[in-house]
Every structure is written in structure tokens, then in C-alpha cells.
């Protein structure tokens, strides 16, 4: 479960275990990390100081991913592990507790991602067993749907914005009838789009985007709500593809060539800058030119 740890500066912790993920919460005040030692650590962030305040234990294998829920649901953190389990943690009265644990998958759960809060309290989980599960908290109870997305394993999942291109957000920030939609990347070299059908209560594949020649390691749907949708996909084929569509049906791709395996892609909050992490320990930043095409504007080497 959860252990209260002594206050320790983040930089003073010896890197005895590989760190797999590090994510700030919505306000940037807390940092969650996870590692091969089967634990999750919570740090308070104040300026340049990171103070360890909690160590969460519950997984039986390396923890690959942590994800903060939107603060409207409270201080909620999800974690996924090689052990095939997904755990939901919540802080109450300054104490972290495990509030839900589920083992729907028969292999590693590689990533978990919360949906935009406008569509509900939903968590998508992608697994090496080829399945995606979607957990939902509603009416004080958890439920789930699980389906096969890629027979050879699902490596990544990313939700679409609650607002489709060209739509207008209401003053309250709520989007009536916001669509439940996400994209996955798999070991079958494909990028797939999925929509939820309220009529059948199931998820259906609406698009299969092909072009990569090796595993798709990561996908990221841009948060932009401009005239087009943008999806970035990172592959072991040493390319990143940027897929664009104005109607969610006809997709075009632009290929960005990189010098090593592309592991991760991440959009800026405004959706106009794409960060690409590659196997040569570099992070490159890309922007779309006004005249079209994409250019690398900065490279950061570790």
C-alpha cells in the first residue's frame, strides 16, 4: 500500500532502478515517478526543490506508467505494470490509498491514459496481450470494457480532444455529447482509431493508418481544436509520422526522419510543437511551417 517517506530531495536519490515515467499533476505541484523497483513515488514540487512525500507499493513487477486524473475528480493517480495490473490511487486527508485494483490483462500493461474530463472519468489501458481495456467510474462504481486492438500487442494509446476540429467550446467548458475517441499504436506497425458506440456499448475501429514498417512505439493526439486534427506516431522504423485530417475520415501523413528508433512523441499544450524522443538520447522539437511541412527547431542531447 502507501508508505510515508521522509522528505528527501529528488536529486539526492540514487538511481539504483530504471525510472520509466515521470508526470506532473494538473497544477505542476506534484510529480509522480515509477520504476523497476515496483514502486511509485510522489514528490512535492516547489521551485527547484522536489521533496519525496510518499512511496506507493502494490505492483508485483516494474511499473511502466503513471497518469494523473483531472483535478475535478480529486487527487487521483493511475499506474500500470508488467504484472498486468492497473491500480487507481487517491489521496485523502494527506494519505494515499489504493481505491481500485484490476487485473484484466494476461500480459504487461504498457500505458494508461485518462480521457478528457468532459467525456467522463475514463481510463484507457493498453497491453502486450493485444487488448485495450477502458475503465469507467460512474455512479460510485467502476466498470470496464475490454477488446482486442492488435494481436501482436498494443504499445500506446492517446485520447482525442473532447472538442472536434471546428467545434466551439461552451463557456462552462463542457461539451454536450462529446465523443469518446482514441488512437492506438501497436506491434503490427499500425495506427488505429477507435470510437465508442453508445448503442452497442462497445468500441469500434473506424480507421487504420498504415505506413510504418516496424513497431509503433507511441502515439499522441494533439490537444489543438483548430481546423484540423493532428496525430503523431513514433516507430522503431526511425520515423515519426504526423497524420492530419479535417473530417476524421480522410487522413494524410507527413514523414519526419530521425537518426534512431523513435520512442516517444508529445505535443505542447497549445498543440503547435511536437517533442520527439529517440534512442540516441536526443529530444527534438518540431513545428509546422506556415508554408506547410515540418521543421526541427531544436535538438536537446542528454
From Swiss-Prot:
Protein name listed in UniProt: Protein transport protein SEC13
Ranges occupied by WD repeats: 14-53, 58-99, 104-145, 149-204, 211-253, 257-296
Subcellular location: Cytoplasmic vesicle, COPII-coated vesicle membrane; Endoplasmic reticulum membrane; Nucleus, Nuclear pore complex
Gene coding for it: SEC13
SS bond list: none
Subunit structure: The COPII coat is composed of at least 5 proteins: the SEC23/24 complex, the SEC13/31 complex, and the protein SAR1. Component of the nuclear pore complex (NPC). NPC constitutes the exclusive means of nucleocytoplasmic transport. NPCs allow the passive diffusion of ions and small molecules and the active, nuclear transport receptor-mediated bidirectional transport of macromolecules such as proteins, RNAs, ribonucleoparticles (RNPs), and ribosomal subunits across the nuclear envelope. Due to its 8-fold rotational symmetry, all subunits are present with 8 copies or multiples thereof.
Family under the similarity heading: Belongs to the WD repeat SEC13 family.
Purpose: Component of the coat protein complex II (COPII) which promotes the formation of transport vesicles from the endoplasmic reticulum (ER). The coat has two main functions, the physical deformation of the endoplasmic reticulum membrane into vesicles and the selection of cargo molecules. It also functions as a component of the nuclear pore complex (NPC). NPC components, collectively referred to as nucleoporins (NUPs), can play the role of both NPC structural components and of docking or interaction partners for transiently associated nuclear transport factors.
Source species, domain of life: Eukaryota
GO biological process: COPII-coated vesicle budding; ERAD pathway; mRNA transport; nuclear pore localization; positive regulation of DNA-templated transcription; positive regulation of ER to Golgi vesicle-mediated transport; positive regulation of protein exit from endoplasmic reticulum; positive regulation of TOR signaling
Chief place of localization: membrane
This protein's UniProt keywords: Cytoplasmic vesicle, Endoplasmic reticulum, ER-Golgi transport, Membrane, mRNA transport, Nuclear pore complex, Nucleus, Protein transport, Repeat, Translocation, Transport, WD repeat
An example Gene Ontology molecular-function term: structural molecule activity
InterPro entries in the record: G-protein_beta_WD-40_rep, Sec13/Seh1_fam, WD40/YVTN_repeat-like_dom_sf, WD40_repeat_dom_sf, WD40_rpt
Membrane topology: Peripheral membrane protein
GO cellular component terms listed in the entry, alphabetical order: COPII vesicle coat; endoplasmic reticulum membrane; GATOR2 complex; nuclear pore outer ring
Amino acid at each position: 500500500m502507501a508508505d510515508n517517506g521522509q522528505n528527501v530531495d529528488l536529486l539526492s536519490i540514487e538511481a539504483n532502478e530504471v525510472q520509466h515515467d515521470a508526470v506532473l499533476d494538473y497544477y505542476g505541484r506534484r510529480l509522480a515517478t515509477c520504476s523497476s523497483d515496483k514502486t511509485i513515488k510522489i514528490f512535492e514540487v516547489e521551485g527547484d526543490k522536489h521533496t519525496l512525500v510518499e512511496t506507493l507499493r502494490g505492483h508485483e513487477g516494474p511499473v511502466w506508467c503513471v497518469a494523473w486524473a483531472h483535478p475535478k475528480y480529486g487527487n487521483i493517480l493511475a499506474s500500470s505494470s508488467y504484472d498486468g495490473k492497473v491500480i487507481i490511487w487517491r489521496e485523502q486527508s494527506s494519505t494515499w490509498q489504493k481505491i481500485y485494483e484490476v487485473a484484466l490483462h494476461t500480459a504487461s500493461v504498457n500505458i494508461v491514459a485518462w480521457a478528457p474530463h468532459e467525456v467522463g472519468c475514463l481510463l484507457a489501458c493498453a497491453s502486450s496481450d493485444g487488448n485495450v481495456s477502458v475503465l469507467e467510474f460512474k455512479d460510485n462504481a467502476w466498470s470496464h470494457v475490454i477488446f482486442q486492438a492488435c494481436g501482436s500487442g498494443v504499445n500506446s494509446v492517446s485520447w482525442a480532444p473532447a472538442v472536434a476540429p471546428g467545434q466551439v467550446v461552451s463557456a462552462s467548458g463542457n461539451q454536450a455529447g462529446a465523443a469518446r475517441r482514441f488512437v492506438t499504436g501497436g506491434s503490427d506497425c499500425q495506427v488505429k482509431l477507435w470510437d465508442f458506440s453508445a448503442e452497442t456499448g462497445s468500441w469500434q475501429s473506424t480507421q487504420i493508418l498504415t505506413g510504418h514498417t516496424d513497431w509503433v512505439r507511441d502515439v499522441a493526439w494533439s490537444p489543438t481544436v483548430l481546423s484540423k486534427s493532428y496525430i503523431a506516431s513514433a516507430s522503431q522504423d526511425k520515423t515519426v509520422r504526423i497524420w492530419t485530417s479535417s473530417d476524421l475520415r480522410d487522413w494524410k501523413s507527413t514523414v519526419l526522419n530521425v537518426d534512431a528508433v523513435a520512442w516517444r512523441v508529445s505535443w505542447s499544450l497549445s498543440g503547435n510543437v511536437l517533442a520527439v524522443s529517440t534512442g540516441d538520447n536526443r529530444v527534438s522539437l518540431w513545428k509546422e511551417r506556415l508554408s506547410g511541412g515540418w521543421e526541427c527547431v531544436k535538438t536537446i542531447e542528454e
